[in-house]
UniProtKB/Swiss-Prot annotation:
Family as reported in the entry's similarity comment: Belongs to the fatty acid desaturase type 1 family.
Catalysis: reaction(s): hexadecanoyl-CoA + 2 Fe(II)-[cytochrome b5] + O2 + 2 H(+) = (9Z)-hexadecenoyl-CoA + 2 Fe(III)-[cytochrome b5] + 2 H2O; tetradecanoyl-CoA + 2 Fe(II)-[cytochrome b5] + O2 + 2 H(+) = (9Z)-tetradecenoyl-CoA + 2 Fe(III)-[cytochrome b5] + 2 H2O; heptadecanoyl-CoA + 2 Fe(II)-[cytochrome b5] + O2 + 2 H(+) = (9Z)-heptadecenoyl-CoA + 2 Fe(III)-[cytochrome b5] + 2 H2O; pentadecanoyl-CoA + 2 Fe(II)-[cytochrome b5] + O2 + 2 H(+) = (9Z)-pentadecenoyl-CoA + 2 Fe(III)-[cytochrome b5] + 2 H2O
Intracellular or extracellular location(s): Membrane
Top-rank lineage group of the source organism: Eukaryota
Signal peptide location: none
Recorded GO MF terms: iron ion binding; stearoyl-CoA 9-desaturase activity
GO biological process: long-chain fatty acid biosynthetic process; post-embryonic development; unsaturated fatty acid biosynthetic process
Organism the protein comes from: Caenorhabditis elegans
Topology in membrane: Multi-pass membrane protein
Domain statement: The histidine box domains may contain the active site and/or be involved in metal ion binding.
Protein name as annotated: Delta(9)-fatty-acid desaturase fat-5
Miscellaneous comment: Cytochrome b5 CYTB-5.2 is specifically required for the desaturase activity, its knockdown or mutation alters the enzyme activity.
Up-regulation conditions: Expression is regulated by nhr-80 and nhr-49 in the intestine.
EC number: 1.14.19.-
Length: 333
């Protein structure tokens, strides 16, 4: 594994927060009144999705076969890992490198999650890290918890986000043929992996009702995975530990680690953005790390970046709290 050099992180514009620009944007935003334009098409789609998901939840609890319950759990785990291990840790942060076969695998399971194609997802996430909690942050917590959770998808993007996002260098993403294939074929891929196969397999393999399979394994599971991911943008900037940086809004949170297969170490992640582990939590709370380590064990993942212990300790002593870190690791480590 490769240990991260701090100056190497700072030199890459999509990894480190630009504190000077953040302060400037925050001061400018105080002088402005934000008028959010609602995108009613998105509102209607999400309302319909949540109604369908509630039907699916009822069926999952009272009507679905046990095999379908397990199938829903498996799909959530795979789809989430396509986001966390793929769009997030591999492509947005370049926290490790992978062979073509592994990248194709991650791209396909990412399509289960249906959270925009990986290029768009990584672009938004790089904006989030570079200009955290400003108008150039897609889901800034300064605009409220609901906005950070899902409201940002229900309104038009702020002009500042469009301007700043256009400045990012995304050439590494556009040069990856796997990502370009997904981008060009996104709707068919989502149709197959997010909706068709999740419905078809329970019907064929264990005789589940097509109606129940669709509402549980497709709609409910899709909606649940969305909220698990969104909780990182909202809950993980709201309540939890801040052992690494008390100045940041990000926190480490146990429950978001469980729901989002290992993404809950958010204070750690914002402090050390290129560490492939994204937290110091134990493996049972970081299934994405387990997946990446498995990929390394079979030769498909390499150059996993980690943060040296002395750098973590120095950071905690200067900007965080060593005692809080010890307490957190005692509970979660």
């Amino acid at each position: 594994m490769t240990q991260i050099k701090v100056d190497a992180i700072i030199s890459k514009q999509f990894l480190a927060a630009d504190l000077n620009e953040i302060r400037q944007m925050q001061e400018e935003s105080k002088k402005q009144v934000i008028k959010m334009e609602i995108v009613w098409k998105n509102v209607a789609l999400f309302v319909a999705l949540h109604i369908g998901a509630l039907v699916g939840l009822y069926q999952l609890v009272f009507q679905a076969k046990w095999a379908t319950v397990g199938w829903v759990f498996l799909l959530h785990t795979l789809g989430s890992m396509g986001v966390t291990g793929g769009a997030h840790r591999l492509w947005a942060h370049r926290a490790y490198k992978a062979t073509l076969s592994w990248r194709v695998f991650l791209m396909l399971i990412n399509s289960i999650a249906f959270q925009n194609d990986i290029i768009d997802w990584a672009r938004d996430h790089r904006c989030h890290h570079k200009w955290t909690d400003t108008d150039a942050d897609p889901h800034s917590t300064n605009r409220g918890m609901f906005f950070a959770h899902m409201g940002w998808l229900l309104v038009k993007k702020h002009d500042q986000l469009k301007i700043q996002g256009g400045k990012l260098d995304l050439s590494d993403l556009y040069e990856d043929p796997v990502l370009m294939f997904q981008r060009k074929n996104y709707l068919p891929l989502v149709g197959i992996f997010c909706f068709a196969l999740p419905t078809f397999i329970p019907v064929v393999l264990w005789g589940e009702s097509a109606f129940i399979a669709f509402y549980t394994a497709a709609l409910f599971r899709y909606c649940f995975t969305l909220h698990a991911t969104w909780c990182i943008n909202s809950v993980s900037h709201w309540v939890g530990w801040q052992p690494y940086d008390h100045q940041a809004s990000s926190v480490d949170n146990l429950w978001t680690s469980i729901a989002a297969v290992g993404e809950g170490g958010h204070n750690y992640h914002h402090t050390f953005p290129q560490d492939y582990r994204t937290s110091e939590h134990a493996e049972f709370l970081n299934w994405t790390r387990v997946l990446i380590d498995f990929g390394a064990s079979i030769g498909m993942v390499y150059d996993r970046k980690t943060t040296p212990e002395e750098v973590i300790q120095r950071q905690c002593k200067k900007f965080g709290c060593e005692t809080e870190r010890e307490k957190m690791l005692h509970k979660l480590g």
